[in-house]
Structure formats: C-alpha cells, structure tokens
Amino acid sequence: RRFSFGVLYAKNWPAWRGVDASGAVESGDYPAELNQNKNLLWKSPLPEKGCSTPIVWENSIFLTSPADGEDAVLGFSMNGEQVWQTTIGPERKGRHLNGSGSNPSVVTDGANLYALFKSGNLACLNMAGKILWKKDLSSYGKDTLYWDFGTSPMLTSEHLVVVLMRKGNSWLLAFDPRTGELVWKKERNYQTPPECDHSYATPTLIKHQGKEAILVWGAERLSAHSAKDGEMLWVSTGFNPKQKKNWVVVGSQVVAGNIAIVPYGRGT
C-alpha cells in the first residue's frame, strides 16, 4: 500500500470528508488530472493495506493502517516523510481480500487525534503520536458487516461520537474526548430486510432549532439525535418501500443548508 499526494490544500482537513463532511472545497485552480506521471508530488509506503483516507492539520498528515498484526496510527510531514507510528492494539483483519480493519478515518480537534478500528480499538493520541487514552468497544458487539467496518468517528463541541450499525448490535455512543469516559449511549436497532440494517455511513453534525444535533443514516432510516444526550429528535423513513433485501447503506449523507442528500439502494 502506498500513500500519494498530488495536491497540497492550504486549509485543514480535520475529518472524513473535511470540515463540513461534504467532501467539497472552495473553487480554485486545482489539477484536473492526477496519475503516476502527472501532478504527483510524492508517494510514501505504508505498512500494510488500509482503507482510511488521510486527514490534514496544519503541517501534518494522519491516517491509520494495520502494522504487523496491530492497529496503528501514522503521522507524516507534508513532504511525505513518516514522522511517527503508534500501535493501539491487536487488529481484526478484513473479511475479504480487499478488506481492512483500518477503514475509519482519524478525526482531530486540532489538539488531539481520535482513531477507531474494526477491532473495537478506540484511542486518543496527541499530535506527536502519544496515546492519551484508549478503550475497547468490542463489548458492544463484534463487527458483522460483510465489507468491514467503515464508519468514522466524529466530534461535536463537547463529545467524541461513535456510531456502530449492524444487525442486532447498533449503538450511538458519546465519549468525553479528554478522558474517554462514556457520557451517554443509545441503542439504534430496527427490524429490516436482510443486510438492510448494515451501514458504513459516517454521522454528520447539524443544527436543529439552534442546537447541535447528530444526523445518522442507517437501517433504512435517517435520524437526528440531540448532541447533548443522544435523544432522538426526528426520524425519516420510507427509503425502501418494497422492502428489498441487501440494500446496504454505503454512502454517507451530505447536508446542504436545510437539505440532507441521502444515497441509498440501487441507483437511488
């Protein structure tokens, strides 16, 4: 596995899909073509195959990877030099040839890094790679997703939020980012056709009536929860009216103003 950089974006990219979880950037003069021979600035080897996307904070790049049977977080300089590598705990390998136990992206508040893995390992590190705390979330149930756990952690103004969405063991969890202490938890289990309760989507932070809320997409439902205590504020259903099986939630929702764009099913 190699990590390549073709564009250096001046602003921070602190989480999966960037600042507002849209994956979009301001308009500008960016290369329209990226390949091994054109606009490639550098590439750096990684320990093993992982599927997390990198995040960027100031002059550093962070991502996850398996490393000799362990879950690891890596820090790089902006010229591709690996600065540090920290192992968190034993990895749980991907189920498939192209799978990985290191799919969720790291998230940062600018002071610390937060990383989550298929194994259930959840850790907080400082920007130099020192572990400040870590937890084992396997007590909430093993990952049973066919294509390996991929939901990234997210931050609210107060909490580190983790969503686990799979058959029979789906949870919305909030932790104190300073200590790792569990602040609140909410079950999120629904009866669905086979595999329709599997979700790889990452939650989104929104505003609801002037207060922070967490938007969660999975199990054929888009739900909003209070960021303070996890209580459900509203839920939208009817995404699979014919109750077809194997409609898995893969793509994360995108919020534009007061509209949530929700990809689902086959060609919808």
Predicted segments, located by residue:
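Noncatalytic, solvent-exposed loop/strand surfaces
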Residues: 3-268
